[in-house]
Curated annotation (Swiss-Prot):
Name by which UniProt lists this protein: Microneme antigen L2
Localization per record: Cytoplasmic vesicle, Secretory vesicle, Microneme
Taxonomic source organism: Sarcocystis muris
Similarity remark: Belongs to the microneme antigen family.
PTM section of the record: Contains six disulfide bonds.
Main location: cytoplasm
Superkingdom classification of source: Eukaryota
SMART domains: APPLE, PAN_AP
Record's keyword annotation contains Disulfide bond: yes
Assembly notes: Homodimer or heterodimer.
Binding site for a carbohydrate: S18, K59, Y66, D71
GO CC terms in record: cytoplasmic vesicle; extracellular region; microneme
Chain's role: Galactose-binding lectin. Plays a role in adhesion to the host cell. Has a potential role in invasion of host cells.
Domain called PAN: residue spans: 9-78, 82-138
Amino acid sequence: AGPQLDVSCFAHDKNIGSRTEQLSVVHVASAQDCMKECQALPTCSHFTYNKNSKKCHLKAGAPEFYTYTGDMTGPRSCEHNCSDACWMDGNNPLAVWDYSGQPPALCWAACMGTPGCDLYTFQGMTCKLYSQTSSKRA
C-alpha cells in the first residue's frame, strides 16, 4: 500500500452528501480509497462516501450539497485548497455557489466539473467560477 492520501480538507462527520450526477458507485473501505477511485477517473471532480454502507459515489460536475446520514463529500484531491482571493474577480462568472462551511477544495471540484471553467475564487462562503476570458490572474 502506497502513501495515504490527504483527506483532511473536508468534513467527515457532518452528513454532507452531493446530489450531482454520478459516474459510478463502488464499495471501498475508506474515504482515502474513495478519493483514490475518483483520481483514477479523469472526469471525476468529487466523491461522496458513506461510512455506513461503504459506498463510494464518484461524481462529475459541481457539488450540490444535501444532508444524508453517514455521507461525506470530498474533492478529487485536497491539494487545491487555495482560498482568500487566489484569483481577481472578473465581470461575469460562469457560476456562483454558496458553499458555506465547505472547504476551498470543493470549489476547485466545482470548477473542474463545470465545462469552460478555468479559474475560481473562494472568498468567505462564495465560490465563483470563471473562464479564462472572464478573469485575470491576481
